[in-house]
């Protein structure tokens, strides 16, 4: 089940199965006024892209029920979604490699406000250049 928060000109998709992590990451994105859609597994993320939804950035966990983050990334990239910044979030070193192999742009072990701010600035800059 997806839900959204509204704000800036950036659209984010948060893919996370653990409720407390969803809440924390959603609050972080809200702090930067990012319009955020939240889903609980990779399958739900893929279904949004199949339905024509577009996002500027995707933040995804690795291990989730139904479909993992790397599986979702591979499917999203295979659909031609190459402009979206995809960030894998996991403390597991093996996950980092899985994310990169699947097509993630970036992998972070823990998302801190400073790191998220930098990623969002980079994403905004990329979006502004492509729409200019």
Swiss-Prot record:
Gene3D superfamilies attached to this UniProt entry: 3.40.50.2300
Biological processes annotated in GO: cytokinin-activated signaling pathway; phosphorelay signal transduction system
UniProt entry keywords in alphabetical sequence: Activator, Cytokinin signaling pathway, Phosphoprotein, Two-component regulatory system
Keyword Ion transport in record: no
Ranges where the Response regulatory domain occurs: 11-125
Post-translational modification: Two-component system major event consists of a His-to-Asp phosphorelay between a sensor histidine kinase (HK) and a response regulator (RR). In plants, the His-to-Asp phosphorelay involves an additional intermediate named Histidine-containing phosphotransfer protein (HPt). This multistep phosphorelay consists of a His-Asp-His-Asp sequential transfer of a phosphate group between first a His and an Asp of the HK protein, followed by the transfer to a conserved His of the HPt protein and finally the transfer to an Asp in the receiver domain of the RR protein.
Pfam families cross-referenced by the UniProt entry: Response_reg
Residues modified to 4-aspartylphosphate: 61
PANTHER family on file: TWO-COMPONENT RESPONSE REGULATOR, TWO-COMPONENT RESPONSE REGULATOR ORR42
Family in the record: Belongs to the ARR family. Type-C subfamily.
Function description: Functions as a response regulator involved in His-to-Asp phosphorelay signal transduction system. Phosphorylation of the Asp residue in the receiver domain activates the ability of the protein to promote the transcription of target genes. May directly activate some type-A response regulators in response to cytokinins.
Name of the protein in question: Two-component response regulator ORR42
